[in-house]
Amino acid sequence: MMRRPPSQGRWSASHQKLLLAFAFILIPWLQLADAQQQPQQPQIRIHSQRGDAPLDKVADDANTRWYATHAAPDVHPEAKFDTVNRKQKQQSTASPQQHQKYRRAPYDYASKDKAQNRYAQHPIRESEKPNYVKVPNDASALATLAPAQPVRAPHTSRHHWPSSSAASGLASPQNARSLEDWEVEDFVLLATVDGDLYASDRKTGRHLWHLEVDQPVVETKHYRTNNSVLDDDYRPVDHYIWAVEPSRDGGLYVWIPDSGAGLVRTGFTMKHLVEELAPYAGDEPPVVYTGDKKTTMVTLDAATGRVLKWFGSSGSQVNEAESCLRPNAFDDRDTTECSSMGTITLGRTEYTVGIQRRDGRPIATLKYAEWGPNTFDSDLYQQYHASLDNHYITSQHDGRIYAFDKSQAENDLPLYTHKFSSPVARVFDVCRPWDANAGSNPELVVLPQPPIPALDESTVKMRSNSIFLNQTESGDWYALSGRAYPLILDAPVAQISRDDLWDMAHAFDSINPNKLSKALVGTHFLNPVKSTGYHQPPTLPAGALDEYYEDLENASNNAHAVTNTVPEEPTIITKVKALPQSAANSVIDFVSNPILIIFLIGSLIYNEKKLRRSYHRFRTHGTIKDVYPFFVIESEAGDESGDDKDGVFPSSPSPRSQPQDQNAEDHLSRHKVERNAGDQDKVKDNRSLHDVSDTLEPSNKTVEKTADVVKQVDVAGPDAPSTDSNGAAPEKKKKAHRGRRGGVKHRKGRPTDGSQSHENDPALTTVDEAVSNAKKLGDRPSLEPDVMTIYNDMQAVTGSVISMGNIEVDTDVELGMGSNGTVVFAGRFDGRDVAVKRMTIQFYDIATRETKLLRESDDHPNVIRYYSQVQRGDFLYIALERCAASLADVIEKPYAFGELAKAGQKDLPGVLYQITNGISHLHSLRIVHRDLKPQNILVNLDKDGRPRLLVSDFGLCKKLEDRQSSFGATTGRAAGTSGWRAPELLLDDDGQNPAAIDSSTHSGSHTILVGDPNSLSNGGRATRAIDIFSLGLVFFYVLTNGSHPFDCGDRYMREVNIRKGNYNLDPLDALGDFAYEAKDLIASMLQASPKARPDSREVMAHPFFWSPKKRLAFLCDVSDSLEKEVRDPPSPALVELERHAPEVIKGDFLKVLTRDFVESLGKQRKYTGNKLLDLLRALRNKRNHYEDMSDSLKRSVGSLPDGYLAYWTVKFPMLLLTCWNVVYNLEWEKTDRFREYYEPAGL
C-alpha cells in the first residue's frame, strides 16, 4: 500500500549511491546536534511496557517449540520462528520542554519524508484478489488460510516506538501517550454489516485490499413456531422483532407488535447485556437472558491486508515470515530487506445473547461481532473526539459512503462517493507515531472515527429520533441510528410508521410475515415525547442510561458543526452542466429496469395470439375494416376460454385423464371444424358454448360468463365420488382423483374451446336464443352431489375481490390460516358477511367430507353454518358463517375483543354448556370431531348481547357407520393437535402397547396408571370419548384464562404428561363456590380410560351447570326423601348417606355454623353435629322458614337462593356432589322426583 502518490517514487541506482555517501558524511553531525539539544534518552520498547515479565522468555521458548511442530511445511526451517531476547531498559526522566523539542525535531520530519519515498515504490495492484479469511476456532486453521507469498524472508524483530512520556520505565503508556504524537495514515479501514473489512485510500476512496470474513456482524434468529394468535401457545413476546445496531457495542432495539410503541430503543447494548446483565430471569413475563462473549485478535499487514497473527481462546498462530516483501525483488534479488508500511492490530469481539421463556422455549438468539481497536490503545481512543485531519466518512442506508473534508467550512461537497454491497458499519482511522523511524515497521493504531457532528440542535434531535431498520440477505435484522449514521435521515420512511398501513390491518397477526418484513424496512421515528428516555420492553429490566448513547451525543456535540446530509449542487450552473449526464443516466436506468423488461416480455407473451392474428390480417387483407367482426369475436371468446383452460383444467387432480397432446388438439379445434355424422350428439352437448361465442357481440359478456360458470361446474363435478342409481355411495378403493372420476366417460379429448365456429351447426340469430341456451345448461344435474351448482354469472376479478356467483372473496382481508396452505378470507354470500375457506385442490377429498358433514350438522345453533362451495382454478372455496373471533382470541387477547370477553365472563358455565351442546349434536349424528381446541371454537354475539359459541373446522371429523362405535387412528399419525389429543390417540400414534408402559409411573394425587389394561377400549381403538377428553382441556382453558392442566411446569411436556396422566387442577380453586364441581367434572373428563369418561349428555347434566336455585332445590329434595327412611335400624339409603359424612362434615357441622344461626336452629328441633342427615335437615328447615329469620340473620346467611346456598357450600364444598352421587348410587335418578337432575340442564 502506498502512502504517497507514485510520482514520489524511488530514485535511480546512481542517485541512491550519491545519497548514501552524503548520508554517511552527514550522520555524525546530526548526532552531535541532537546531543546538544537534549540529553540522551534511552529507547523503551512498547511491547516490553505491555508486560515483559520474567516469564516472557519461557513463553517465547514455548512458542518456538509449538511453532516448530505446527508451522506450514513450505516455510524454511530458519524462518519458522525467531526468538528475540528481550532486555528491559530503564527510561530516564525528561522534562516537558525536552519532550516538545524531541517531538518537533527536524529529524522526525526528514525521516517521515524518507518513509514517504520508501513506500511510494510499492503501489497496491488492483488486480490483487481479496483475501478470504475464515476466523478459525483453533490456531492451526490460520496456516491453511494465510495467503502464500512468492518471496519469503526471515522473521524480523519487533520494532518499538520512542517514548512520548517522561515517566519511569514502569509507567503505563495509557497515562503517558498523547494523541498529538500521532498522525493519520493515508488510508482508512471500513467494516461492513456483512462482516468484511476494506482498506480504501483516505482521499480518493480507491480500493486497496479486502479481507473477507465468513460471519456477518449481526445475526438475529427468531423462533416463531406459532405464527398466529390462534395458536394455543401464542405469547406476544414470541413475536418481538429484535434488531442490533452494528456500531459501538451493539445497541439493542425491539419492535413490539400491537403495543402502539413501534420500534423501541431498549437502552441496552449487546455488551451490556452479556457483561453486566446476563444471566437474568424475569417474572413478568417469564423471560430468561443468557449471554457469552468471545474475543479474538488479529494482526494484519497494512500493505496487503494479510493476516500475520491470530490469537484466540483456543490457541494462536503467527505467520509473520510470510508477509515479508522485498522492496525491489527484480533488481535486488540478493537483498534481504523487507518492505512494510506497518502492522494493524484489530480485535474482534463476538457477543451472543440467548432469550428464552422460562418454560424452556427459545424466543430469539442475537449475535453481534464487532471489529475494534486494541484495548491497549484505549488511552488514545478516549482522546479521539474529532478526526485529526477533519476528514469524515459516513455511510448511507444502501451501502453508499460519502467522504467530507471539513477543514474548509465553505466546502460542503463530498470528496468522493463509493458503493458497497452492504452498509458500512464502522470507519476506522489508522494512525502512526510522528517519530517513527524511516526504516521501521511500526504497529499502527486503529481508532474508530467519530460520527460527523450535527449542524444544530434540531438536527441533533432528528438524529436522536430516527432509526433505520433493515434486513441482511440472510434475514437478520439490524438498525442504523441517526446518531451514528447521519445520512439515514434521507432514507425512505418505513411503511409501518405510517398510519394508513394500520388502517388496513389493525392487528399484527393479520399481516402476512413477508408483508410485515417489507413494511418494517425503512426509517422509524421514536416517540418524541419519550425520546429523552430509553425504554425497556416488558422483557427487560429497567436500567440506567446506556453510555453508548451518551458517547454518541457527546461525539456529535463536541466537534465542529457540519452538514449531516449529502449537499445539493450550490449553483444553477453546476446543475445545468450535470443535465446531460443526468438524462443519460435516467435513460440507462429506465431501459435497464428489470421490471420494465419483465413487463414487456409478459405483454408480448400475453398478446402473442393477437399479434399473430394482426400480422396475418394485414398480410392478407391489408386493412382492419375487412376483418373487424371476426377479430373482435374471436379474441374475446378466445381469451376467456383460454383463461378457463388455464385456471380449471390444471386444477384437476387426475393427470391420467388428460392426454399430452391435449393442448395441440384444442389449438387445432379452434381453426378446423371437421365433424362426422356420428358426432352430432356430442356437438349438440357442447354447442352452447360455441354458439354463444359465435353470435354475441363483444358488449354482451354476461352470456359468456354464464357459460364459463357452467363449464367450471362440469369440470369440478367429476372430481367427486360417483353415486349409483339408488344414491348409495360405492365403496372407495382409491381416492376420488385417481383413474376415472365420478362415472364420467374416459374421453381422450376435452370439450372443445368456446371460441370455435362451426360451419355445420345452426347459427343462433338472436341474443335471446343464446341466453336461453345458456340458461338451459344449468338445468343439467351436477355430477358432484357435494358441490353446489352456481347459476349466477361468473364475475371478473376486480382488484382483491374475486366474485364467483353468489360468493365474493376479499383476498386482502385474511381472517386466519390453517395447515397445508388453507387460508380463511373475508367474503360475502347473497349479501351477508361470510368467511370463505380456501383450500388447495389436492385436499378435495377432505373438503368434500367436511362440507358433507357440515350439511348434516349445521342445523344447530352451536355448530358453524355452511353456505356454499365452489371451485376456481387450483382452489376450493367454502363459504361459512362468519364469526367475530375464536375462543383463543377472546381468552388470549381480551383487550382486543372486550365486548365478547365481558359477555363471556358473566356466564362461564353457559359458554361451556354451548360448546358441549354442539359436540353432543355431532355425537348424536355419529360424528367425532377429533380436533377440538380453542382455535376451532368460534364466538359471536347474539342480538341480546349474549355470546354464542360454535364448533367449527370439520376437516378431521370422522363419521361412524351404522353399528360402529369406534375407529382406528389415522394411518401414520393420529389426528388432532399436539397437546389437545386424548391419551389413547398418543399411545396408538406411538405404536405402543399400553400394558407395556411402566404402570408404576405416577406423580401426585392426580396420577392415572397408564398400564391399566382397561385404559383403552376396543383394543386401542378411539371412540367419541376422545372429544370428551379434548373438551375437558377446553373447559380448563376457559375457566383459568388460558392455562393447560398438563403443562405441569413445562409446555413441551404436555403430551408426555398426558401419556402418564399427570395433571394439575389447582388453578380452578380461584372459582370459589364452583371450584369443587368444576374439578370433579374436568377430572372425570380427563380420565385415561375412555370408558371412565362421561358422554356429552352426562357432561351437560353435571351439577356444575346448575343454577343456584336448582342446586338448593336438589338438596332440599334429597333431605325430604331421606327423612322418610327408616332410622332404627337405618335403611340402606341412610347408611349410604352417612358413609360420606366424615369427608363432608369433617367433625361437627354445628361448630362451623355461626352462633346466631345455631341458636335459631334449637327452636325447632335438636341436631347432631356429625350426622349428614341432620345437616341436610337444617339446610331445608331454614330454607323453608327463611322469612321467619331476623333481619340480622338474613344478612348473615345471604339472600335466596344465591347467598343462602353459598353460606352452606363454602363451609361444606363436597355437600352437593356427595348427595348427587348418593342419589345415583341408590338408583333414584330414574324416579320422577330426581329425573330432571340427571338430564341436560337446558341452559
Swiss-Prot record:
Q: What CDD domains does the annotation carry? A: Luminal_IRE1, RNase_Ire1
Tell me a GO cellular component.
IRE1-TRAF2-ASK1 complex
One term of GO molecular function: ATP binding
Taxonomic path: Eukaryota, Fungi, Dikarya, Ascomycota, Pezizomycotina
PANTHER family given in the database record: IRE1-RELATED (PTHR13954), NON-SPECIFIC SERINE_THREONINE PROTEIN KINASE (PTHR13954:SF6)
Pfam families in the record = Pkinase (PF00069), Ribonuc_2-5A (PF06479)
Low complexity compositional bias, start-end: 163-172, 650-660
- Please indicate which superkingdom the organism of origin belongs to: Eukaryota
Residues involved in ADP binding: 819, 837, 881, 883
Q: What is this protein called?
A: Serine/threonine-protein kinase/endoribonuclease IRE1
Q: Which Gene3D superfamilies match?
A: KEN domain (1.20.1440.180), Phosphorylase Kinase, domain 1 (3.30.200.20), Transferase(Phosphotransferase) domain 1 (1.10.510.10), YVTN repeat-like/Quinoprotein amine dehydrogenase (2.130.10.10)
Q: In which residues is Mg(2+) bound?
A: 936, 953
The cofactor named in the record is: Mg(2+)
* Protein source organism: Hypocrea jecorina (strain QM6a)
Enumerate the UniProt keywords alphabetically.
ATP-binding, Endoplasmic reticulum, Glycoprotein, Hydrolase, Kinase, Magnesium, Membrane, Metal-binding, Nucleotide-binding, Serine/threonine-protein kinase, Signal, Transferase, Transmembrane, Transmembrane helix
Composition bias, Basic residues? 732-749
Residue ranges, Cytoplasmic side: 607-1243
Residue intervals of the Protein kinase domain: 809-1105
Q: Where in the cell is it found?
A: Endoplasmic reticulum membrane
Output compositional bias ranges, type Polar residues.
90-99
Catalytic reactions of this protein: L-seryl-[protein] + ATP = O-phospho-L-seryl-[protein] + ADP + H(+); L-threonyl-[protein] + ATP = O-phospho-L-threonyl-[protein] + ADP + H(+)
KEN domain location: 1108-1240
Task: Just give the chief location class.
Answer: endoplasmic reticulum
Listed Basic and acidic residues bias regions: 73-85, 674-693
